[in-house]
Amino acid sequence: MKIFTCGDSYEDKATCIYRAWEYALGLGQGAAGHGEVKILREPIAQLDMFAEYVHIDGEQDIAEKFTRSVRSISPVVYRNVFYALLSDCGEAVDAVYRYLILAFREGRRVEHMLIRPEAMRVMELSRNVSNESHKFREMARFTSVDRKVYVCHIEPKCDVSM
């Protein structure tokens, strides 16, 4: 098993998914298959003794390719993937990877396949990020500093400061 690790930004996560997909399809060497790939966000709490770890840094052009590919499925799939990648959940990147395996196979029908655990998990992550974003937009309270600047202090769990 090969475990790909990445940082916290969208670019890092998108690049990591792209590189893991390349490895699974065996571009450049023998095909490993999607079952031999796992993606984790750093820092990693507990290492697997029998797995090989590969750190992936974000690359803007790869992240753009990833985004174009996901958008080609459907706008709803792209929104769900984007929001899920903003989640604070440690398994979100791997959940998106498993969802995209299904999404590229099924196309836009994946939007309605909530019986599948991969689709349901990404929908849950997306909904949680969307709800938290809405909550902070709705409940943000600003205070005036010297009647010149308004300041609001928020501490979201997910990366909702988009």
Where are these regions (language model features)?
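A contiguous, surface-oriented mixed alpha/beta subdomain in the mid-to-C-terminal portion of proteins
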Residues: 115, 124-162
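N-terminal ordered "arm"
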Residues: 1-58
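Charged, alpha-helical interface segments at or near domain boundaries
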Residues: 40-137
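Conserved aromatic-histidine-acidic binding/catalytic patches
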Residues: 2-10, 117, 152-158
